[in-house]
């Protein structure tokens, strides 16, 4: 348990979508350790309920493509804890692993955009609805480092994540007048239990040698954006990619230079 001095979200209420696993679960656990009351919104009921049991958190079943579900999740946070300080729009899917536009199905494109972008739109809309009267709040969405560097990403995924960045910036302009900050965090490849010990994977997906991005690292970035430490940060796309987005892998002259 973080000490009182280090509990950066003490007294705050956070709603996290897609919090039953992955980045969302890591954020739920981290936010809770830092004093936040956490509402977990997900479609994976059993996994989410187990996390709630661990954290003493609240669970609400939520399909982020359905406005009623998202509205209910936000209302649950307010009715249970009296307010909503932090909205983390994290629910997302990658879609089919098809990389050529000619092989991309419209049905998959729509499905990915519905979850990744429409879900963020609905979460932002309803979080703003309850935050505006209080003239404060932090809305954070999970985008992707692929928005900063094209790298053979499936079209549905990359289009949805670019949309998240655009939505974030536009909402930041509007919400700034109400004292509400809107940002997104853009991770690169996140190691999973199956890949984190694979040397090839670590080398391929890391520019910072010896470092591999984990869900916990992304949660730490979200914690910063959720906390008062980032009180003057809004409209920002926080890249958590180890510098990959600024590096041209096909023309890395530093590897050719003498030391």
Swiss-Prot record:
One GO CC term on file: mitochondrion
MF annotations from Gene Ontology: oxidoreductase activity
Name of the protein described by the UniProt record: Borneol dehydrogenase, mitochondrial
EC number: 1.1.1.-
Dependence of activity on temperature: Optimum temperature is 32 degrees Celsius.
Annotated tissue distribution: Specifically expressed in glandular trichomes of mature flowers.
Compartments (UniProt record): Mitochondrion
Major localisation: mitochondrion
Keywords recorded for this protein, A-Z: Mitochondrion, NAD, Oxidoreductase, Transit peptide
Gene that specifies this protein: BDH
InterPro entries reported in the protein's UniProt record: NAD(P)-bd_dom_sf, SDR_fam
Residues that coordinate or bind substrate: 144, 157
tRNA processing as UniProt keyword: no
Family as reported in the entry's similarity comment: Belongs to the short-chain dehydrogenases/reductases (SDR) family.
EC class name: oxidoreductase
């Amino acid at each position: 348990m973080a000490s009182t001095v280090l509990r950066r979200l003490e007294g705050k209420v956070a709603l996290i979508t897609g919090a039953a696993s992955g980045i969302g679960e890591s954020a739920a656990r981290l936010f809770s350790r830092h004093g936040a009351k956490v509402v977990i919104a997900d479609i994976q009921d059993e996994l989410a309920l187990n996390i709630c049991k661990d954290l003493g958190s609240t669970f609400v079943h939520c399909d982020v493509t359905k406005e009623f579900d998202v509205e209910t999740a936000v209302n649950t946070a307010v009715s249970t804890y009296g307010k909503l300080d932090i909205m983390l729009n994290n629910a997302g899917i990658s879609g089919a692993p098809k990389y050529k536009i000619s092989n991309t199905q419209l049905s998959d494109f729509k499905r990915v955009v519905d979850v990744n972008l429409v879900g963020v739109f609905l979460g932002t809309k309803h979080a703003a609805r309850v935050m505006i009267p209080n003239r404060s709040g932090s809305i954070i969405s999970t985008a992707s480092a692929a928005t900063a560097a094209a790298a053979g990403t499936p079209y549905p995924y990359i289009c949805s994540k670019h949309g998240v960045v655009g939505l974030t910036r536009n909402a930041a302009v509007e919400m700034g007048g109400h004292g509400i900050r809107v940002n997104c965090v853009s991770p690169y490849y996140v190691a999973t239990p199956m890949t984190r010990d694979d040397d090839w994977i670590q080398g391929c997906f890391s520019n910072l040698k010896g470092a591999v991005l984990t869900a916990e690292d992304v949660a730490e970035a979200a914690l910063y954006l959720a906390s008062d430490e980032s009180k003057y940060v809004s409209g920002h796309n926080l890249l958590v990619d180890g510098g990959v987005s600024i590096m041209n892998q096909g023309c890395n002259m530093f590897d050719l230079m003498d030391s």
